[in-house]
Amino acid sequence: MRWIGIDPGLRITGFGVIDVDGQKLTYVASGTIESGDPAKGLPERLGALYAGVKEVLETYRPEQAAIEEVFLNVNPRSTLMLGQARGAVIAALVSEKLPVAEYSALRVKQAIVGTGRAAKPQVQEMVKRLLRLSRAPGTDASDALGVAICAAHHSQIPKAITSALASKKRSK
């Protein structure tokens, strides 16, 4: 199963693509999509994010998508802008008929590092280790890969429960 994880941002949006085969995670690609010059209008910048995500989807053809949820910022304007960027990204994902899972930053950090209070360098290091990379990707790409890994692990939980219940029934 191929997953794409997205760490949305108005200025820079990170993406990470992984293949999942049972418990095996394989790195495919990661990078960033930039919305362009902040002097450009918001609609143009959102359009650039949408187009950039569509290009990544066409290149890597994921089967599932996951995106980080918006967190409440001290600055309400920043939260609103992030929400709009996230909306442009989600629109690109659903335009390709991808199922989209959403995870909080806390949940992603718990899945990757084991604590929701992990710092970005800790997330980068664990992503590097989990995907057996020679060096850690940049913070935006690492965060996006973390979202994909978190989603892949959470998608395995219902299968594991179903399998355990089926095996319990057979043993009776």
Swiss-Prot record:
Top-level taxon in the UniProt lineage = Bacteria
One example of a Gene Ontology biological process annotation: DNA repair
Write out the residues that bind Mg(2+) 2: 68
InterPro entries, per database record: RNaseH-like_sf (IPR012337), RNaseH_sf (IPR036397), X-over_junc_endoDNase_Mg_BS (IPR020563), X-over_junc_endoDNase_RuvC (IPR002176)
The record's subcellular location field reads: Cytoplasm
Q: So where's the catalytic machinery, residue-wise?
A: 7, 68, 140
Which Pfam family, giving just one, matches this sequence?
A: RuvC
Q: How does it assemble?
A: Homodimer which binds Holliday junction (HJ) DNA. The HJ becomes 2-fold symmetrical on binding to RuvC with unstacked arms; it has a different conformation from HJ DNA in complex with RuvA. In the full resolvosome a probable DNA-RuvA(4)-RuvB(12)-RuvC(2) complex forms which resolves the HJ.
Q: What is the name of this protein? A: Crossover junction endodeoxyribonuclease RuvC
Organism field = Polynucleobacter asymbioticus (strain DSM 18221 / CIP 109841 / QLW-P1DMWA-1)
